[in-house]
Amino acid sequence: INILNRNSNDLNKHAADFKGMRYWSPKFILDQIDILSRMGIKTLRIADEMFFLNKKYYIPILEGIIERGYDLNMWAYARIDTVREDQLELFKKAGINWLALGIEAGNQNVRLDIEKGKFKDVNISEVVKLIQKYDINVLGNYMFGFPEDNLSTMQETLDLALNLNTEHANFYATSALPGSPLYFQAKKNNWELPSKYEEFA
């Protein structure tokens, strides 16, 4: 739904280096949903991890979905450190029945090293329970193999996933995708990386 507004094509820059974001207007997004709705599509995935970071963009979209009465079944991504209780009722009313959370790791030091937010201020279990309180299902995303990981920290991640027991869970092997901070860390440390883009898949 939004596009990273790069102001440089420097290969040594990663996504966090670019502050600007170009957004489609709420009207444009709603008109696209209208097209899908007329085709009989009821289930939508908002595959945009940044969608819920800016209220002035997502609130008009969700309110528009409610006003137009689409009766959708949607799922969306959210960062574990940006979930806000005052918005969850709106999410549910608009038809967001699933939130996929980037929980990533069970160990706090590993989470802090990921550079995705102030995880130290977040009680993951409370966030999951809060979302579920609004009858929204949680999909937990976990990753194994961060640079700070070892067998003990990866066991913590598995234990956290088992304890949270979310409605669904995905487990991934960490990959240093081109443009990510981990990619540049790997290059700097001369870690072996795939030679072709398709090999990152």
Q: Could you tell me what each predicted segment is?
A:
Residues 159-168:
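Basic phosphate/pyrophosphate-binding loop/patch that engages nucleotide-derived ligands
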Residues 153-157:
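Short alpha-helix in the alpha/beta-hydrolase fold that links the catalytic acid
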Residues 1-139, 146, 159:
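Radical SAM [4Fe-4S] cluster-binding motif and immediate context
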Residues 4-5, 56, 109, 114, ...:
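Flexible glycine/acidic-rich beta-alpha junction loops that bind and position SAM and/or redox cofactors
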